[in-house]
Amino acid sequence: MQRVQSAVDFSNLLNPSESTAEKRDHSGSPRQQTAQPQQQQQQPQPEADMATVGLLRPNGPLPGAQATEPANELPRPYKCPLCDKAFHRLEHQTRHIRTHTGEKPHACQFPGCSKKFSRSDELTRHSRIHSNPNSRRGNKGQQQQQHPLVHNHGLQPDMMPPPGPKAIRSAPPTAMSSPNVSPPHSYSPYNFAPSGLNPYSHSRSSAGSQSGPDISLLARAAGQVERDGAAHHHFQPRFQFYGNTLHAATASRNQLPGLQAYHMSRSHSHEDHDDHYGQSYRHAKRSRPNSPNSTAPSSPTFSHDSLSPTPDHTPLATPAHSPRLRPHPGLELPPFRNLSLGQQHTTPALAPLEPALDGQFSLPQTPPAAPRSSGMSLTDIISRPDGTQRKLPVPKVAVQDLLGPADGFNPSVRNSSSTSLSGAEMMDRL
Protein backbone atom coordinates (compact mmCIF):
# COMPACT_ATOMS: atom_id res chain seq x y z
CA MET A 1 0.00 0.00 0.00
CA GLN A 2 1.39 3.40 -1.01
CA ARG A 3 2.00 5.93 1.76
CA VAL A 4 0.57 9.42 1.35
CA GLN A 5 3.32 12.03 1.38
CA SER A 6 2.83 14.98 3.72
CA ALA A 7 3.72 18.63 3.09
CA VAL A 8 6.89 18.32 5.23
CA ASP A 9 9.18 15.43 4.32
CA PHE A 10 9.99 13.96 7.75
CA SER A 11 12.13 11.20 6.24
CA ASN A 12 14.81 13.72 5.30
CA LEU A 13 14.87 15.09 8.84
CA LEU A 14 15.14 11.70 10.48
CA ASN A 15 17.84 10.39 8.09
CA PRO A 16 20.48 13.13 7.54
CA SER A 17 23.13 10.62 6.36
CA GLU A 18 21.34 9.93 3.07
CA SER A 19 22.68 11.39 -0.14
CA THR A 20 21.24 14.54 -1.69
CA ALA A 21 20.04 12.53 -4.68
CA GLU A 22 17.76 10.52 -2.44
CA LYS A 23 16.54 13.71 -0.78
CA ARG A 24 15.47 15.26 -4.09
CA ASP A 25 13.83 12.11 -5.44
CA HIS A 26 10.12 12.58 -4.75
CA SER A 27 8.91 9.96 -7.20
CA GLY A 28 10.28 6.87 -5.47
CA SER A 29 8.87 3.37 -5.81
CA PRO A 30 6.39 1.99 -3.23
CA ARG A 31 8.99 -0.44 -1.97
CA GLN A 32 11.43 2.33 -1.08
CA GLN A 33 8.70 4.33 0.63
CA THR A 34 7.64 1.36 2.77
CA ALA A 35 11.23 0.63 3.72
CA GLN A 36 11.81 4.13 5.09
CA PRO A 37 9.56 3.75 8.17
CA GLN A 38 11.45 0.58 9.15
CA GLN A 39 14.78 2.43 9.10
CA GLN A 40 13.27 5.30 11.10
CA GLN A 41 12.30 2.93 13.91
CA GLN A 42 15.80 1.37 14.10
CA GLN A 43 17.82 4.62 14.20
CA PRO A 44 17.62 7.09 17.15
CA GLN A 45 16.11 10.56 16.59
CA PRO A 46 18.67 13.35 17.04
CA GLU A 47 17.36 16.42 18.85
CA ALA A 48 19.40 18.86 16.74
CA ASP A 49 17.58 17.88 13.54
CA MET A 50 14.17 18.48 15.09
CA ALA A 51 14.99 22.15 15.59
CA THR A 52 15.21 22.72 11.83
CA VAL A 53 11.51 21.98 11.23
CA GLY A 54 10.53 25.63 11.72
CA LEU A 55 12.98 26.78 9.01
CA LEU A 56 11.42 24.69 6.23
CA ARG A 57 8.73 25.97 3.89
CA PRO A 58 5.84 23.56 3.07
CA ASN A 59 6.04 23.69 -0.75
CA GLY A 60 9.34 25.50 -1.18
CA PRO A 61 12.73 24.16 -2.25
CA LEU A 62 14.93 22.02 -0.06
CA PRO A 63 17.15 23.59 2.63
CA GLY A 64 20.29 22.92 0.61
CA ALA A 65 19.11 25.09 -2.30
CA GLN A 66 18.05 28.12 -0.22
CA ALA A 67 21.61 29.26 0.38
CA THR A 68 22.17 30.17 -3.28
CA GLU A 69 19.01 32.37 -3.79
CA PRO A 70 19.94 35.45 -1.71
CA ALA A 71 23.20 35.78 -3.60
CA ASN A 72 21.37 36.19 -6.94
CA GLU A 73 18.89 38.94 -5.76
CA LEU A 74 19.80 42.61 -6.08
CA PRO A 75 19.70 44.74 -2.98
CA ARG A 76 16.59 46.86 -2.34
CA PRO A 77 17.78 49.91 -0.48
CA TYR A 78 14.73 52.11 -1.12
CA LYS A 79 12.04 51.23 1.39
CA CYS A 80 8.60 52.79 1.62
CA PRO A 81 8.15 54.76 4.85
CA LEU A 82 4.43 53.98 4.91
CA CYS A 83 4.57 50.24 4.32
CA ASP A 84 7.12 47.38 4.33
CA LYS A 85 7.82 47.33 0.60
CA ALA A 86 11.36 47.92 -0.70
CA PHE A 87 12.42 48.84 -4.22
CA HIS A 88 15.60 48.63 -6.30
CA ARG A 89 15.30 52.12 -7.84
CA LEU A 90 14.35 55.49 -6.46
CA GLU A 91 11.74 56.24 -9.13
CA HIS A 92 9.94 53.04 -8.22
CA GLN A 93 9.79 54.14 -4.62
CA THR A 94 8.54 57.60 -5.62
CA ARG A 95 5.83 56.12 -7.82
CA HIS A 96 4.76 53.83 -5.00
CA ILE A 97 4.58 56.64 -2.45
CA ARG A 98 2.17 58.55 -4.73
CA THR A 99 -0.30 55.70 -4.38
CA HIS A 100 -0.49 56.54 -0.68
CA THR A 101 -0.60 60.34 -1.01
CA GLY A 102 -2.78 60.59 -4.15
CA GLU A 103 -0.44 63.08 -5.79
CA LYS A 104 -0.84 63.48 -9.59
CA PRO A 105 1.86 65.85 -10.86
CA HIS A 106 1.59 64.88 -14.55
CA ALA A 107 -1.22 67.01 -16.00
CA CYS A 108 -2.44 66.90 -19.59
CA GLN A 109 -1.28 69.93 -21.59
CA PHE A 110 -4.04 69.68 -24.19
CA PRO A 111 -6.29 72.80 -24.03
CA GLY A 112 -9.60 72.05 -22.42
CA CYS A 113 -8.49 68.78 -20.82
CA SER A 114 -8.06 68.66 -17.04
CA LYS A 115 -6.77 65.11 -16.67
CA LYS A 116 -3.90 64.46 -14.24
CA PHE A 117 -1.85 61.34 -13.72
CA SER A 118 0.63 60.10 -11.13
CA ARG A 119 2.83 58.34 -13.71
CA SER A 120 4.42 59.75 -16.83
CA ASP A 121 3.63 56.68 -18.92
CA GLU A 122 -0.07 57.13 -18.18
CA LEU A 123 0.15 60.71 -19.42
CA THR A 124 1.87 59.53 -22.60
CA ARG A 125 -0.86 57.00 -23.23
CA HIS A 126 -3.52 59.63 -22.59
CA SER A 127 -1.92 62.12 -24.99
CA ARG A 128 -2.44 59.69 -27.86
CA ILE A 129 -6.19 60.21 -27.52
CA HIS A 130 -5.87 63.87 -28.46
CA SER A 131 -3.33 63.29 -31.21
CA ASN A 132 -5.40 60.59 -32.94
CA PRO A 133 -8.13 62.27 -35.06
CA ASN A 134 -10.12 59.06 -35.47
CA SER A 135 -10.61 58.60 -31.76
CA ARG A 136 -14.05 59.25 -30.30
CA ARG A 137 -12.60 60.86 -27.22
CA GLY A 138 -10.50 63.14 -29.40
CA ASN A 139 -13.67 64.42 -31.05
CA LYS A 140 -15.13 65.04 -27.63
CA GLY A 141 -12.08 67.09 -26.74
CA GLN A 142 -12.60 69.29 -29.79
CA GLN A 143 -16.22 69.82 -28.85
CA GLN A 144 -15.14 70.75 -25.36
CA GLN A 145 -13.15 73.61 -26.85
CA GLN A 146 -16.12 74.85 -28.85
CA HIS A 147 -18.48 75.03 -25.88
CA PRO A 148 -16.50 77.59 -23.83
CA LEU A 149 -16.01 79.76 -26.92
CA VAL A 150 -19.70 79.77 -27.69
CA HIS A 151 -20.70 80.66 -24.15
CA ASN A 152 -18.08 83.39 -23.85
CA HIS A 153 -19.10 85.18 -27.04
CA GLY A 154 -22.78 84.98 -26.06
CA LEU A 155 -24.13 83.71 -29.36
CA GLN A 156 -27.85 83.20 -29.68
CA PRO A 157 -29.25 79.66 -29.86
CA ASP A 158 -30.39 80.23 -33.46
CA MET A 159 -26.82 81.05 -34.57
CA MET A 160 -25.13 77.93 -33.20
CA PRO A 161 -24.75 74.72 -35.23
CA PRO A 162 -26.24 71.54 -33.79
CA PRO A 163 -23.69 69.63 -31.67
CA GLY A 164 -22.92 65.94 -31.63
CA PRO A 165 -25.29 63.47 -30.00
CA LYS A 166 -23.23 63.01 -26.83
CA ALA A 167 -21.11 66.11 -26.40
CA ILE A 168 -19.72 66.70 -22.91
CA ARG A 169 -18.46 69.84 -21.28
CA SER A 170 -15.16 69.78 -19.48
CA ALA A 171 -15.15 70.39 -15.76
CA PRO A 172 -13.13 73.19 -14.11
CA PRO A 173 -9.39 72.48 -13.76
CA THR A 174 -9.66 71.99 -10.00
CA ALA A 175 -12.36 69.30 -10.14
CA MET A 176 -12.29 65.83 -11.64
CA SER A 177 -14.86 65.02 -14.31
CA SER A 178 -15.99 61.64 -15.56
CA PRO A 179 -15.97 61.17 -19.37
CA ASN A 180 -19.00 58.87 -19.27
CA VAL A 181 -21.33 61.20 -17.37
CA SER A 182 -22.32 64.54 -18.84
CA PRO A 183 -24.07 67.32 -16.89
CA PRO A 184 -27.71 67.96 -17.80
CA HIS A 185 -26.99 71.51 -18.99
CA SER A 186 -24.07 70.69 -21.29
CA TYR A 187 -26.10 70.28 -24.47
CA SER A 188 -26.29 73.15 -26.88
CA PRO A 189 -29.84 74.22 -27.74
CA TYR A 190 -31.13 72.70 -30.94
CA ASN A 191 -33.89 74.36 -32.91
CA PHE A 192 -36.76 72.27 -34.22
CA ALA A 193 -37.72 74.98 -36.72
CA PRO A 194 -35.73 77.87 -38.23
CA SER A 195 -38.15 80.41 -36.82
CA GLY A 196 -37.35 82.18 -33.57
CA LEU A 197 -40.95 81.95 -32.36
CA ASN A 198 -40.75 78.26 -31.65
CA PRO A 199 -41.46 77.69 -27.93
CA TYR A 200 -38.55 75.25 -27.67
CA SER A 201 -35.97 77.51 -29.29
CA HIS A 202 -35.62 79.92 -26.38
CA SER A 203 -32.57 79.50 -24.18
CA ARG A 204 -32.72 78.64 -20.52
CA SER A 205 -30.18 80.08 -18.13
CA SER A 206 -29.12 77.78 -15.33
CA ALA A 207 -25.85 78.27 -13.46
CA GLY A 208 -24.65 80.67 -16.13
CA SER A 209 -24.99 78.23 -19.05
CA GLN A 210 -27.48 77.97 -21.90
CA SER A 211 -29.20 74.67 -22.54
CA GLY A 212 -31.82 73.18 -24.82
CA PRO A 213 -34.21 70.24 -24.69
CA ASP A 214 -32.53 67.02 -23.72
CA ILE A 215 -33.80 63.47 -24.08
CA SER A 216 -36.30 63.78 -21.21
CA LEU A 217 -37.72 66.99 -22.68
CA LEU A 218 -38.18 65.29 -26.05
CA ALA A 219 -40.01 62.47 -24.35
CA ARG A 220 -42.33 64.90 -22.59
CA ALA A 221 -42.98 66.71 -25.87
CA ALA A 222 -43.87 63.44 -27.60
CA GLY A 223 -46.25 62.57 -24.78
CA GLN A 224 -47.86 66.00 -25.03
CA VAL A 225 -48.41 65.51 -28.77
CA GLU A 226 -50.12 62.18 -28.13
CA ARG A 227 -52.36 63.70 -25.46
CA ASP A 228 -53.26 66.59 -27.74
CA GLY A 229 -54.05 64.15 -30.52
CA ALA A 230 -56.37 62.22 -28.21
CA ALA A 231 -58.05 65.44 -27.10
CA HIS A 232 -58.40 66.47 -30.76
CA HIS A 233 -60.31 63.28 -31.61
CA HIS A 234 -62.42 63.73 -28.49
CA PHE A 235 -63.60 67.20 -29.46
CA GLN A 236 -63.93 66.49 -33.19
CA PRO A 237 -67.65 65.40 -33.29
CA ARG A 238 -68.62 68.36 -31.17
CA PHE A 239 -66.75 70.71 -33.46
CA GLN A 240 -68.20 69.22 -36.65
CA PHE A 241 -71.75 69.63 -35.39
CA TYR A 242 -71.21 73.37 -35.08
CA GLY A 243 -68.95 73.49 -38.13
CA ASN A 244 -71.07 76.06 -40.00
CA THR A 245 -70.45 78.91 -37.58
CA LEU A 246 -67.20 80.80 -37.11
CA HIS A 247 -67.81 81.15 -33.38
CA ALA A 248 -67.84 77.40 -32.85
CA ALA A 249 -64.68 77.08 -34.91
CA THR A 250 -62.79 79.57 -32.76
CA ALA A 251 -64.15 77.96 -29.60
CA SER A 252 -62.98 74.55 -30.73
CA ARG A 253 -59.58 75.95 -31.60
CA ASN A 254 -59.29 77.44 -28.12
CA GLN A 255 -60.00 74.01 -26.66
CA LEU A 256 -56.83 72.68 -28.37
CA PRO A 257 -54.04 74.98 -27.14
CA GLY A 258 -51.18 72.57 -27.73
CA LEU A 259 -51.68 71.76 -31.42
CA GLN A 260 -50.77 75.23 -32.61
CA ALA A 261 -47.36 75.10 -30.93
CA TYR A 262 -46.41 71.75 -32.48
CA HIS A 263 -47.92 72.02 -35.95
CA MET A 264 -46.87 75.55 -36.96
CA SER A 265 -43.66 77.48 -36.51
CA ARG A 266 -45.19 80.97 -36.56
CA SER A 267 -47.86 82.50 -34.37
CA HIS A 268 -51.46 82.91 -35.54
CA SER A 269 -54.14 85.30 -34.37
CA HIS A 270 -57.80 84.40 -33.92
CA GLU A 271 -58.70 86.22 -37.13
CA ASP A 272 -56.28 84.18 -39.27
CA HIS A 273 -58.82 81.41 -39.66
CA ASP A 274 -58.15 79.98 -43.11
CA ASP A 275 -54.38 79.85 -42.65
CA HIS A 276 -54.74 77.96 -39.37
CA TYR A 277 -56.87 75.16 -40.77
CA GLY A 278 -54.93 75.03 -44.02
CA GLN A 279 -51.64 74.38 -42.24
CA SER A 280 -53.26 71.84 -39.93
CA TYR A 281 -54.53 69.98 -42.99
CA ARG A 282 -51.15 70.03 -44.71
CA HIS A 283 -49.39 68.86 -41.56
CA ALA A 284 -51.84 66.00 -41.14
CA LYS A 285 -51.20 64.81 -44.71
CA ARG A 286 -47.44 64.77 -44.12
CA SER A 287 -47.74 62.62 -41.01
CA ARG A 288 -46.96 58.93 -41.05
CA PRO A 289 -49.66 56.26 -40.56
CA ASN A 290 -48.28 55.32 -37.14
CA SER A 291 -48.06 58.87 -35.87
CA PRO A 292 -50.59 60.25 -33.35
CA ASN A 293 -51.98 62.64 -35.94
CA SER A 294 -54.34 61.02 -38.42
CA THR A 295 -54.21 61.64 -42.14
CA ALA A 296 -57.79 62.90 -42.18
CA PRO A 297 -58.36 66.67 -42.03
CA SER A 298 -58.28 67.94 -38.48
CA SER A 299 -61.38 70.05 -39.03
CA PRO A 300 -63.73 70.88 -41.92
CA THR A 301 -62.31 73.64 -44.07
CA PHE A 302 -64.40 76.72 -44.67
CA SER A 303 -64.92 78.28 -48.07
CA HIS A 304 -65.01 82.06 -47.86
CA ASP A 305 -65.16 82.43 -51.64
CA SER A 306 -68.81 81.44 -51.71
CA LEU A 307 -71.44 83.91 -50.55
CA SER A 308 -73.78 81.15 -49.42
CA PRO A 309 -74.04 80.59 -45.66
CA THR A 310 -73.71 76.83 -46.22
CA PRO A 311 -71.15 74.91 -48.33
CA ASP A 312 -72.24 73.18 -51.49
CA HIS A 313 -70.95 69.80 -50.30
CA THR A 314 -70.70 68.84 -46.68
CA PRO A 315 -67.64 66.71 -45.72
CA LEU A 316 -68.10 63.01 -45.25
CA ALA A 317 -67.06 63.20 -41.62
CA THR A 318 -69.83 65.65 -40.69
CA PRO A 319 -73.31 64.42 -39.71
CA ALA A 320 -76.01 64.52 -42.35
CA HIS A 321 -78.06 67.67 -41.91
CA SER A 322 -80.14 69.81 -44.22
CA PRO A 323 -78.38 72.85 -45.68
CA ARG A 324 -81.24 75.15 -44.75
CA LEU A 325 -82.51 74.90 -41.21
CA ARG A 326 -86.21 75.08 -42.13
CA PRO A 327 -88.92 72.42 -41.77
CA HIS A 328 -89.76 72.28 -45.50
CA PRO A 329 -89.45 68.64 -46.60
CA GLY A 330 -89.14 69.12 -50.35
CA LEU A 331 -86.64 72.00 -50.44
CA GLU A 332 -83.15 71.23 -51.82
CA LEU A 333 -80.54 73.68 -52.98
CA PRO A 334 -79.04 73.08 -56.43
CA PRO A 335 -75.31 72.27 -56.39
CA PHE A 336 -73.06 75.13 -57.40
CA ARG A 337 -71.08 73.13 -59.95
CA ASN A 338 -74.19 72.75 -62.12
CA LEU A 339 -74.58 76.51 -62.44
CA SER A 340 -72.82 78.46 -65.15
CA LEU A 341 -72.07 82.13 -65.64
CA GLY A 342 -74.44 82.38 -68.59
CA GLN A 343 -77.41 81.15 -66.58
CA GLN A 344 -76.91 83.32 -63.56
CA HIS A 345 -79.51 85.84 -64.81
CA THR A 346 -82.13 83.23 -65.60
CA THR A 347 -81.67 80.63 -62.88
CA PRO A 348 -81.42 81.93 -59.30
CA ALA A 349 -78.46 80.70 -57.27
CA LEU A 350 -80.62 80.14 -54.21
CA ALA A 351 -84.16 78.97 -53.79
CA PRO A 352 -86.86 81.49 -52.81
CA LEU A 353 -87.27 82.25 -49.19
CA GLU A 354 -90.72 80.64 -48.91
CA PRO A 355 -91.05 78.09 -51.73
CA ALA A 356 -93.33 75.67 -49.85
CA LEU A 357 -96.99 75.47 -50.81
CA ASP A 358 -99.83 75.67 -48.35
CA GLY A 359 -100.69 72.01 -48.87
CA GLN A 360 -97.20 70.80 -48.07
CA PHE A 361 -96.78 72.53 -44.75
CA SER A 362 -98.98 74.86 -42.77
CA LEU A 363 -97.70 77.04 -40.00
CA PRO A 364 -99.85 77.40 -36.88
CA GLN A 365 -102.00 80.43 -37.66
CA THR A 366 -103.14 82.85 -35.06
CA PRO A 367 -106.93 83.30 -34.74
CA PRO A 368 -108.20 86.31 -36.67
CA ALA A 369 -109.00 89.36 -34.74
CA ALA A 370 -112.64 89.90 -33.85
CA PRO A 371 -114.48 92.53 -35.85
CA ARG A 372 -114.26 95.73 -33.94
CA SER A 373 -117.48 97.51 -33.19
CA SER A 374 -118.03 101.13 -33.79
CA GLY A 375 -117.72 101.84 -30.08
CA MET A 376 -114.63 102.73 -28.10
CA SER A 377 -111.88 100.21 -27.58
CA LEU A 378 -110.69 98.83 -24.26
CA THR A 379 -107.48 100.85 -24.34
CA ASP A 380 -109.43 104.07 -24.82
CA ILE A 381 -111.58 103.30 -21.81
CA ILE A 382 -108.63 102.44 -19.55
CA SER A 383 -106.69 105.52 -20.62
CA ARG A 384 -109.40 107.92 -19.49
CA PRO A 385 -108.22 110.19 -16.68
CA ASP A 386 -111.53 110.10 -14.85
CA GLY A 387 -112.08 106.86 -12.94
CA THR A 388 -115.86 107.09 -13.12
CA GLN A 389 -115.81 106.98 -16.88
CA ARG A 390 -113.84 103.73 -16.95
CA LYS A 391 -116.82 101.45 -17.57
CA LEU A 392 -117.03 98.68 -20.08
CA PRO A 393 -120.07 98.78 -22.33
CA VAL A 394 -122.36 95.80 -22.62
CA PRO A 395 -121.27 93.77 -25.64
CA LYS A 396 -123.68 93.72 -28.52
CA VAL A 397 -123.49 90.58 -30.64
CA ALA A 398 -125.36 90.33 -33.91
CA VAL A 399 -127.44 87.29 -34.85
CA GLN A 400 -125.27 86.58 -37.89
CA ASP A 401 -122.22 86.34 -35.71
CA LEU A 402 -123.86 83.82 -33.39
CA LEU A 403 -124.99 81.58 -36.27
CA GLY A 404 -121.73 81.66 -38.25
CA PRO A 405 -119.50 78.65 -37.42
CA ALA A 406 -116.25 80.11 -38.76
CA ASP A 407 -116.42 83.53 -37.26
CA GLY A 408 -113.46 82.97 -34.97
CA PHE A 409 -115.28 83.45 -31.64
CA ASN A 410 -114.84 80.98 -28.81
CA PRO A 411 -117.99 79.22 -27.53
CA SER A 412 -117.72 81.08 -24.26
CA VAL A 413 -117.82 84.40 -26.08
CA ARG A 414 -121.02 83.52 -27.93
CA ASN A 415 -123.01 83.55 -24.68
CA SER A 416 -124.05 87.17 -24.31
CA SER A 417 -125.30 86.82 -20.77
CA SER A 418 -122.07 85.35 -19.47
CA THR A 419 -120.11 87.99 -21.32
CA SER A 420 -122.21 90.71 -19.80
CA LEU A 421 -121.67 89.34 -16.32
CA SER A 422 -117.97 89.16 -16.92
CA GLY A 423 -117.92 92.73 -18.11
CA ALA A 424 -119.85 93.88 -15.05
CA GLU A 425 -117.44 92.14 -12.72
CA MET A 426 -114.52 93.77 -14.50
CA MET A 427 -116.07 97.22 -14.08
CA ASP A 428 -116.48 96.62 -10.35
CA ARG A 429 -112.87 95.59 -10.01
CA LEU A 430 -111.64 98.69 -11.82
Curated annotation (Swiss-Prot):
The keyword ATP-binding does not apply. Residues 30-46, 289-303 have a biased composition (Low complexity). Residues 1-77, 97-187, 265-340, 357-430 are annotated as: Disordered. Its main location: nucleus. Residues 1-19, 130-147, 175-187, 412-422 have a biased composition (Polar residues). InterPro entries: creA/MIG_C2H2-ZnF, Znf_C2H2_sf, Znf_C2H2_type. SUPFAM superfamilies: beta-beta-alpha zinc fingers. GO terms for molecular function: RNA polymerase II cis-regulatory region sequence-specific DNA binding; zinc ion binding. A zinc finger (C2H2-type) spans 78-100, 106-130. It holds the Pfam family zf-C2H2. Keywords: DNA-binding, Metal-binding, Nucleus, Repeat, Repressor, Transcription, Transcription regulation, Zinc, Zinc-finger. GO terms for biological process: regulation of DNA-templated transcription. Residues 97-106, 268-277 have a biased composition (Basic and acidic residues). Belongs to the creA/MIG C2H2-type zinc-finger protein family. PANTHER family: REGULATORY PROTEIN MIG1-RELATED (PTHR47428:SF1). This is DNA-binding protein cre-1.
